Each structure stands twice: as C-alpha cells, then as structure tokens.
C-alpha cells in the first residue's frame, strides 16, 4: 500500500496490538457494534477505542477499569469548525470520559499560510483537553511537504502530544514517507500516529519502522491475526 521499508520490526500480536487505536468512525455504527468493538479491544489489548463523540459515554462505560483508552475525534473530518466549537466538543468528550482527543487542524488556514490561526486553534483545544492526550490530524494527503512540516511544528508549539497523518476521509491515508517526515520534524518530543489505509500487519510494521508510535486502524483484528500467524509460523517452521 505504501513505500516499502527494508527492515520491518519483529513484533508479535500482543506487542503490535499495544500500538493500535481500534477505530470505528462510520456514521452508521450503532450501540451494539460499538460495544462489541470495546470487547475486542479488551480481548486483544489495543491501546484505545476511537469513535465519534456521540459514542464516548458508551465507550467510557464499557472500558472503565480495563486500561484501554477512550479516544474521540473532534472537528472531524474536515477541521472546518470554528475554534469555539472544537473547544466545546473537546470539553464535552473529556467530561464524558475521553482520555484521548484526535482533532483536525484548520486545513484551509494552514494552506493560506495563517500559521498563527492554526497554532491558536490547536492550543485552545489542548487547553480544553485537560489531562487527555491531544493528537493533531494534519491531513497529509492535502499538503505538500513544507506544509506537512509546518503543521507538525505548529502542533508542537501549541502543546499537542501527537501528530497524526490522516482522517481516512480525504482520499488518502498514511504513507511511510509522510510518517518519516513527521518523525523527523517533531523528533522524540511528540508521538506520531499513522492512520488511514493501514489494513495489514506489514502495513502497520512499515509505519512503525518509519517512526510511528501509534497506529489508527479499523482492520485491527486482521492485523493482529496476521501477526499471530506469523509468530506461530516462525516458531513452528522447519
């Protein structure tokens, strides 16, 4: 799906699961499916369950005491809400149990060169997050490399905890090249989340090899099943 990486890390199913935000952002996802998603996350040890804001109270209740994080998107998927709306949305999801917030930047402002507006938008949401982690979605497929790097720098300056490649709703997803650029830009100061189009074990491992510290995926079960099969095959091979 993306540029090959020569050497992939050797991660077992449990190790790989710990990188993954088990993601369900379809607008037609109902309560039963969301609840099952939470059960899967607990069973496999995924890092968090990532859902739309309206589902956060259910997810927080289902995951209470499990150690699995509760992640909400805001300003999603276009990032085109006024800052005050993003702040209200962030405050609401945190009040209802979100431990992580994935926001979309003001993409138009970034492309217009209005860096201060982008930084202020992120900083305001960060303040509303309190102790919750903030991941900033830069929507890399809509940006050139200079804009990608700028978005990462502004996120760091605004106090974000992670930068994230994609919403998965803009026609492009994570690439190893973009992840590597983002990692070079933020260094070790921030996490880097690869999301959008990560569907296989090798996809996930390429992202991690390029510098990702978190993976967003809806194909999480298939990814860890492949990792488990690869590990079993290696142990049982001749």
UniProtKB/Swiss-Prot annotation:
Pathway field: Carbohydrate degradation; 2-deoxy-D-ribose 1-phosphate degradation; D-glyceraldehyde 3-phosphate and acetaldehyde from 2-deoxy-alpha-D-ribose 1-phosphate: step 2/2
CDD domains: DeoC
GO molecular function: deoxyribose-phosphate aldolase activity
List of catalytic residues: 102 (proton donor/acceptor), 164 (schiff-base intermediate with acetaldehyde), 193 (proton donor/acceptor)
GO terms for cellular component: cytoplasm
Keyword Cytoplasm part of the UniProt annotation: yes
Reaction catalyzed: 2-deoxy-D-ribose 5-phosphate = D-glyceraldehyde 3-phosphate + acetaldehyde
Localization (cell): Cytoplasm
UniProt-recorded name of the protein: Deoxyribose-phosphate aldolase
Organism the protein comes from: Rhodospirillum rubrum (strain ATCC 11170 / ATH 1.1.1 / DSM 467 / LMG 4362 / NCIMB 8255 / S1)
Lineage: Bacteria, Pseudomonadati, Pseudomonadota, Alphaproteobacteria, Rhodospirillales
Gene designation: deoC
């Amino acid at each position: 799906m993306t540029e090959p990486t020569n050497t992939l890390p050797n991660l077992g199913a449990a190790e790989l699961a710990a990188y993954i935000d088990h993601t369900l952002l379809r607008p037609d996802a109902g309560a039963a499916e969301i609840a099952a998603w939470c059960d899967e996350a607990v069973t496999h040890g995924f890092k968090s369950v990532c859902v739309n804001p309206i589902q956060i109270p259910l997810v927080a209740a289902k995951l209470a005491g499990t150690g699995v994080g509760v992640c909400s998107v805001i300003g999603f998927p276009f990032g085109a809400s006024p800052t005050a709306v993003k702040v209200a949305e962030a405050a609401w999801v945190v009040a209802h149990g979100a431990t992580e917030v994935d926001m979309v930047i003001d993409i138009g402002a970034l492309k217009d060169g209005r860096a201060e507006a982008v930084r202020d938008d992120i900083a305001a949401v960060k303040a509303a997050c309190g102790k919750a982690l903030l991941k900033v979605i830069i929507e890399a497929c809509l940006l050139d490399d200079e804009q990608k790097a700028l978005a990462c720098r502004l996120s760091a300056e605004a106090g974000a905890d992670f930068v994230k490649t994609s919403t998965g709703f803009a026609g492009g997803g994570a690439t190893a090249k973009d992840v590597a650029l983002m990692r070079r830009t933020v260094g070790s100061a921030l996490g880097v989340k690869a999301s959008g189009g990560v569907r296989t074990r090798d996809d996930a491992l390429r992202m991690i090899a390029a510098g990702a510290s978190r993976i967003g995926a809806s194909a999480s079960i298939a990814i860890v099943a492949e990792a488990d099969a690869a590990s079993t095959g290696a142990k049982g091979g001749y």
